[in-house]
């Protein structure tokens, strides 16, 4: 019991340090965050403009709401992942990665604390980006009337994203400069978010993976919450429990794979040199 209390206390100290670290980062480099949101905002607007020019009068046939929600979620996944693997890449260059690896805490604990510390900022970024599209695109059927369910789904979804981030961080430990490769994967997630579930055949492996992947489960829930055409929210306790369990299992799998890759990196001496 004492050991558990000590572990929780130590983890809270790490979390406090990471929150302070993130605050200092925001205070010193505010333009980096602002410019990231701005350029992410501009990119999708350019996509819509391109569609409107190529198919005059047919842009309304697009499911703009689903595209925008999926795109904002992709930004949420991207910023979360970069907070883990991107920082490992930077620390391997500055020499601070070795200090983390020989501290009294495991790298996995430090990364988890870092992810939790940055999560409020990333949720705010999601809201800001979605709100910008809401006010700049006419007749957009997106509503913020159910913020409790929005936040609940994003928090549960974040657990699954942490699993993805652990895997990306482990690959970064082994190969270091892999940022461009991960950006391609993040845009592949965008394809998943934009996928029409009705076009997948029930009972197939692809459909089963789509229905149980935490990121696509979160996307499906957010569509029901945010898009006005869904008048009633029909979330059963069983559905939310399945969503939570799947996210936890994915996070545990990601943590396990990260530990394997961290041990391999230690064996190869990759934590002490770039």
Set out the residue ranges of the language-model regions.
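Hydrophobic transmembrane alpha-helices and immediately adjacent juxtamembrane helices
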Residues: 1-274
